[in-house]
Amino acid sequence: MGQAQSGNFSNFGDGANGDNKKDQKKDKPKYEPPVPTRTGRRKKKAQSGPDASAKLPTVIPTTRCRLRLLKMQRIHDHLLMEEEYVQNQERLKPQDERTQEERNRVDEIRGTPMSVGTLEEIIDDDHAIVSTAGPEYYVSIMSFVDKDMLEPGCSVLLHHKAMSIVGLLLDDTDPMINVMKLDKAPTESYADIGGLESQIQEIKEAVELPLTHPELYEEMGIKPPKGVILYGAPGTGKTLLAKAVANQTSATFLRVVGSELIQKYLGDGPRLVRQLFNAAEEHSPSIVFIDEIDAIGTKRYDAQSGAEREIQRTMLELLNQLDGFDTSQRDIKVIMATNRISDLDPALIRPGRIDRKILFENPDEATKRKIFTIHTSKMNLGEDVNLEELIQCKDDLSGAEIKAIVSEAGLLALRERRMRVVMDDFRQAREKVLKTKDEGGPAGGLYI
């Protein structure tokens, strides 16, 4: 019995343990996926009822919509700017009309024509003493003249009848000087010159090198030349070489013909020379090219008329300007050109004023070949063209005459509706140029 009871108790214990294990399995939680995290704003619940049918749907813009919006905003900004500009123009238009009316009224008071005088002395706020080519006048100063800018020695505008001061010339430089100054450098270069190797070398050493590398002359302990004179027969490349020098350097190029320095009134010629060199100093480094210098630089003699004496005064002023150069004005170079150097005054071309004299002669065969090659490089030549026939001719041709032959040959080809130049065109052009030269050539060996 004892064993039976013990056995029963053991069975009872085993049954209790089994029930506990079943309960633990039931209590163990099952795996559940995590709740997804919410990003952005909480979604609103869809409304229901009568208000939901009247509400507009929400449209979320895409990238294309944003670009279109930016484009429309930019167009709107431009339209606003245009509207503001139109309003400003309409507002300023009456002001411009009033300004123009005031200018017209001042011009009526000034009158035309006006003369130019020099202010000698300021007496008071309303009166001054001016001089015009000699005599002095006690004149009044108009109220619209800026009195703060008046100072002795300045140029003023005078009424042609009342001789009162009606204006002020801010720039004393003659307008002709501004015409002489070339704003753009010439297009010619050394490559456009056939031959003239020695002349190019000499003008480089005298004009170009002192402007580009002045330190070389300082190291050598010498002063660079002040100027050069180019002389020789017409059409040998004097003006062309001067233009090539201006092209190679970044200097201001002032070109004047000697006849332009001969003026009508007394003292205007020397004044123009002074203003020419003042403008050259102001725009330095600069090159002053005086072509046909024999117009004012001829030998001095007893003048028989006032015009001849005025020409001599102009030359004396030119000599004074050449002597007035100092070390601070080394950036100004003078180039002169003439066909008749024998007629020039020795004082003008002496060393110290014009340090180099460069001779230009008619080209030889090698130079002729280079000139023909330069001028025919862009032409359509026929197969029968033989330039050696023209080069070996014994005609005394200059560079300008060779260019005229080439141009005339091209014109003859165009006359016959041809775009290609043949040898007959060159022969006819050569005969025509030589005939013109023989008929219009100067007599007595003088150059015009």
From Swiss-Prot:
Superkingdom of the source species: Eukaryota
Binding site for ATP: G232, A233, P234, G235, T236, G237, K238, T239
Cellular component aspect of the GO annotation: chromatin; cytosol; nucleus; proteasome regulatory particle; proteasome regulatory particle, base subcomplex
Keyword Glycosyltransferase recorded: no
Pfam families linked: AAA, AAA_lid_3, Prot_ATP_ID_OB_C
Compositional bias ranges of the Basic and acidic residues kind: 19-31
Location of this chain's protein in the cell: Cytoplasm; Nucleus
Main function: The 26S proteasome is involved in the ATP-dependent degradation of ubiquitinated proteins. The regulatory (or ATPase) complex confers ATP dependency and substrate specificity to the 26S complex.
Protein name (record): 26S proteasome regulatory subunit 4 homolog
Gene (name only): mts2
